[in-house]
Amino acid sequence: MVKTEQIDMSSVKMGDIIYVPLDEEDGLILKDGYKDRNKYIVIIGFTPEGVAVGALLINSEIDSSKRSEELLNCQYPLMVRNYRDILDYDSWLDCSDIFELSKLKITKKNGKLKGCLIPEDRERVMQFLRETEVFDNATKKRYGI
């Protein structure tokens, strides 16, 4: 029997990796005529009212718009050896931009739970997010960082 990946948003936790189509309405910048793109996101927090999550994107390459020193320092490497069931190659977790996504929308778009950050990566990413000046205190507080 094939293990279902359909996501139960009530049980999602920090560090979970979800595969979901995102579009411009979600804050994604789309190129080449795409209406949406399937993306891996990592949950890094929840809004106080509990209806939305704060998420970071996993990218196979660092986007050209993130090449300044400040934004390059916000790219966290995810090694394929730690995520063989999820990633096909070493990738980058973009810690410079938090996407707020409603739990309902992730469910409606058939988001799939693919796994979770390994504890070491989760701790380092959350520590970075707590200490970075890229996000103001209000943003950090909104997602419980």
Task: Report the location of each language-model feature.
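Compact nucleic-acid interaction/catalytic patches
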Residues: 29-38, 43-82
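Mixed-charge, Lys/Arg-rich low-complexity intrinsically disordered regions
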Residues: 1-12
